[in-house]
A protein has these predicted regions:
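Beta-propeller-forming repeat regions
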Residues: 1-223
Length: 223
């Protein structure tokens, strides 16, 4: 923090249009010991705004997009050099959730490589299993996190998950902020079934008498 160093990357990675999420974080994506950059972009260019219904109630604009980009570090952690960002894929197609992707890379299924969980502009979660390896990640198509055969959902929208072993039991939980500033724990059960890690439904953190609140659009960070 002694001096500012300008990154050789565009502020809006891969996009010149309207965005409402621009989420940067470090991760050693390919296990080479160097911290790469991943960027979640919420692209509203096709979607526009919420007034595009016609008289028949049909949506006339395009979809809302949520992409994940990787900028590999070809240098060192002390002197990083980032190559041009590329859009990550899963199941042979670009990862594209419903805006606000908030990407989290962690070993959610306990097999030694980094899987991916994304949030979205609405209230649910997408899981992308790493079916490659730690050094050569390859992601399967998205699956919804679920509990008792129903999708896990937050109470509100614009959710921001942060992966952390909250209870120090050896598996990776999620601490999630939502639109009104509340924060919830989604606890990993330690089990994986049918290739999908199993989580408990959200439990909102509380103060002595009410929900713990941090204003609007809470963005928790675990470390």
């Amino acid at each position: 923090l002694e001096s500012r160093v300008k990154l050789p990357l565009a502020p809006k990675v891969g996009h010149a249009g309207k965005i409402r999420a621009n989420q940067w974080k470090y991760v050693d994506y390919d296990g080479d010991g160097r911290l790469d950059l991943v960027v979640g972009i919420g692209d509203w260019t096709d979607y526009g705004w919420d007034n595009a219904y016609n008289a028949r109630g049909e949506w006339t604009n395009g979809p809302l997009h949520g992409y994940v980009y990787l900028a590999r570090n070809s240098g060192t952690n002390a002197r990083p050099q980032y190559v041009s960002p590329v859009k990550l894929t899963a199941g042979g197609q670009a990862i594209d959730v419903f805006g606000w992707p908030s990407p989290n890379f962690a070993d959610f299924d306990g097999d030694g490589d980094l899987d991916l969980i994304c949030g979205e502009f609405l209230d649910r979660f997408s899981y992308f299993e790493n079916v490659g390896s730690r050094m050569r990640p390859r992601y399967a198509s998205a699956r919804r996190l679920e509990h008792k055969q129903r999708p896990i959902a937050m109470n509100l929208q614009m959710i921001v998950p942060a992966a952390i072993d909250w209870d120090k039991d050896g598996d990776i939980d999620l601490v999630v902020g939502d639109e009104d500033g509340r924060v919830a724990l989604i606890e990993h059960t330690g089990r994986t079934r049918d290739g999908l890690p199993r989580f408990q439904p959200p439990r909102y953190f509380q103060q002595q008498a009410a929900d713990m609140k941090f204003g609007a659009l809470a963005t928790p960070c675990g470390f």
